[in-house]
Amino acid sequence: MREIIQGLLFVALGSVFGGMARFWLSGMVARRIGETFPWGTLTVNVSGAFAIGVFGALAASGHGVFSTPGPWLFAVTGFLGCYTTVSSFALQTLALARDGESLRAISNVTFSLVFCLIAVALGFAAARVLA
């Protein structure tokens, strides 16, 4: 029971920081670039994909910070789980499509998929080089 409560606390704490980081970064990007395209959400999701690539590579190595469950629960389940957002991506894409912005909607799907996959691969590679 103690491990479950401890795990919940790691996830909760990571979620608080992940949510605040998402709010700040997404808003900052939207204010600087504009809101005609969901650049803030795309930035958050791509940077989150890079981070999970790094964390995944560290976990796959079998040693280091992710050799115990606490850091993974905090960083991946909590922080990145709250930081990245598929639901906002889906809502913004639907809004673009419903507003007759089909090209922007398709671009959002394409950019998100391609850039997030590239970011995960780059994060994984960066962690391997640094390890």
Curated annotation (Swiss-Prot):
Regulation: Na(+) is not transported, but it plays an essential structural role and its presence is essential for fluoride channel function.
Leader peptide range in chain numbering: none
Transmembrane regions: 4-24, 46-66, 71-91, 105-125
Sequence positions that bind Na(+): G81, T84
Pfam families reported in the protein's UniProt record: CRCB
Catalytic activity, as annotated: fluoride(in) = fluoride(out)
Family: Belongs to the fluoride channel Fluc/FEX (TC 1.A.43) family.
Function statement: Fluoride-specific ion channel. Important for reducing fluoride concentration in the cell, thus reducing its toxicity.
Protein name, per record: Fluoride-specific ion channel FluC 2
Gene: fluC2
